[in-house]
């Protein structure tokens, strides 16, 4: 391994003159060095999970499960079962998160267990499609609910929607670049806001039940089918329910910034996912106290229709709640996706500048700018919804691959420290459930799934050219070094130190012995920037 890559984890960065780096003491997590801060406590950790799971779906279109389940009772069962399966998957990720205590989530786990190519493909599909498209869609939903009251008789102009979505992305990127604490406070506030809005829906549902409005909750009516029962549609209902819980694994992307991750990672999971399951189930119960299944399926914004029926002049609360929920969702996604790209760059799978952090704010500014720019590019395309359909299958495929990796790790390395060790029955249950859903997805939409696989496999030549090929032309290396140096000076960023004795340090050293990074700076660049006077 060349010295340049080793320098990434060098914790003794000095000035050219031989003195220590002048990064402020508060910047690092220890010893005055520049490092990611451990600022995410239990409350903020719960906010990240809840805020990323609960987006606009439960307010706007929870009807996907009901439409395919065929009855209210079966739909509620689907919500409960998918919540339970999500808890099982989260328990598997909790064990992996404390066994491999690195940011990057399933990307880091897949890479460490199955090798660089498998990890790169997970990162490739996330960088290329998943995060940019999802963030663009959430931002567009936010702008739609903000602008719709200004255009009561028509749809808001498309250009206005995209402009406001871009402003939302730029504002939240600035917040995340400025301070981890600001970003987590924004997440906490907007998560609390969406939970209060859902609590209002649930309370109104309880009031409706007390008034005797529970026709569709009586067993004889709850299981009355409004369409012919079909096992394929029931499977699709489970798939829709699983999509609604998407984001449950996002806390694993920021493991290194958690305060006491060995305790707070599992605690946040145990608190957040049962809470989300409770909210999802009882919000749907509340909806059917005010609307029949047919009315619910006909509504384009279920919570808004619910509010119009029960809130009267206060019905405006619901669209505002959707807007607040999506705003918080964009913030949470920017926060976690930037850490994924940061982790990928640190492993040598993305340009190395993305693995740098600001010398005083200790935020991964290059990674945040990267995810923001890629999302803005998606905003100007017209095919992002199609792309989401294509790669949704791949995203959930990697959930199964990651959990399978837990079993492989138990077999290959049975003696490594595991602060949390769950029964192997849990990953087996999870894998059986996901095998059923993935096989059904392949059977029902083979073309869509095939295109998704093809998009993922475009990463194979990129991996061999960018990562595996070690002896690149000197002109290419010189250009990348120049680009890295310019980016460092523009963003005032350096490589972070790695805390001694952490699992991250050992994992990075193992990585360096096994593979060459995609882009590799020389050691002097970091020192040059560290020696610059800071603004």
From Swiss-Prot:
Q: Name one GO biological process term.
A: tryptophan transport
Tissue expression remark: Strongest expression is observed in kidney and moderate expression in placenta and brain, followed by liver, prostate, testis, ovary, lymph node, thymus, spleen, skeletal muscle and heart. Also expressed in fetal liver as well as in the retinal pigment epithelial cell line ARPE-19 and the intestinal epithelial cell line Caco-2.
Q: Where does L-leucine bind?
A: 53, 246
UniProt catalytic activity = L-histidine(in) + L-phenylalanine(out) = L-histidine(out) + L-phenylalanine(in); L-tryptophan(in) + L-phenylalanine(out) = L-tryptophan(out) + L-phenylalanine(in); L-isoleucine(in) + L-phenylalanine(out) = L-isoleucine(out) + L-phenylalanine(in); L-valine(in) + L-phenylalanine(out) = L-valine(out) + L-phenylalanine(in)
What is known about regulation of its activity?
A: Inhibited by the L-type inhibitor 2-Aminobicyclo-(2,2,1)-heptane-2-carboxylic acid (BCH).
InterPro entries hit by this protein: AA/rel_permease1 (IPR002293), AminoAcid_Transporter (IPR050598), L_AA_transporter (IPR004760)
Which residues make up the annotated site Important for substrate specificity? 134, 246
| Skewed-composition ranges (Basic and acidic residues) | 1-17
- Annotated L-tryptophan binding lies at 134, 395
Q: Where in the cell is it found?
A: Cell membrane; Basolateral cell membrane
Q: Where is this region: Disordered?
A: 1-30, 502-535
Q: Which UniProt keywords apply?
A: Amino-acid transport, Antiport, Cell membrane, Disulfide bond, Membrane, Phosphoprotein, Transmembrane, Transmembrane helix, Transport
Q: Name one GO molecular function term.
A: neutral L-amino acid transmembrane transporter activity
Q: Which chain regions cross the lipid bilayer?
A: 45-65, 74-95, 117-149, 158-178, 182-210, 231-252, 266-287, 313-338, 365-382, 387-408, 424-446, 447-466
Q: How does it assemble?
A: Disulfide-linked heterodimer composed of the catalytic light chain subunit SLC7A8 and the heavy chain subunit SLC3A2. SLC3A2 acts as chaperones for correct plasma membrane trafficking and stabilization of SLC7A8 and modulates the substrate affinity and specificity of SLC7A8. ICAM-1 associates with the heterodimer SLC3A2/SLC7A8; this interaction regulates SLC7A8 activity.
- Family, per entry: Belongs to the amino acid-polyamine-organocation (APC) superfamily. L-type amino acid transporter (LAT) (TC 2.A.3.8) family.
> What is the protein's known function?
Associates with SLC3A2 to form a functional heterodimeric complex that translocates small and large neutral amino acids with broad specificity and a stoichiometry of 1:1. Functions as amino acid antiporter mediating the influx of extracellular essential amino acids mainly in exchange with the efflux of highly concentrated intracellular amino acids. Has relatively symmetrical selectivities but strongly asymmetrical substrate affinities at both the intracellular and extracellular sides of the transporter.
Which PANTHER family does the record cross-reference, listed alphabetically? AMINO ACID TRANSPORTER, LARGE NEUTRAL AMINO ACIDS TRANSPORTER SMALL SUBUNIT 2
Protein name in the entry: Large neutral amino acids transporter small subunit 2
Q: Which gene encodes it?
A: SLC7A8
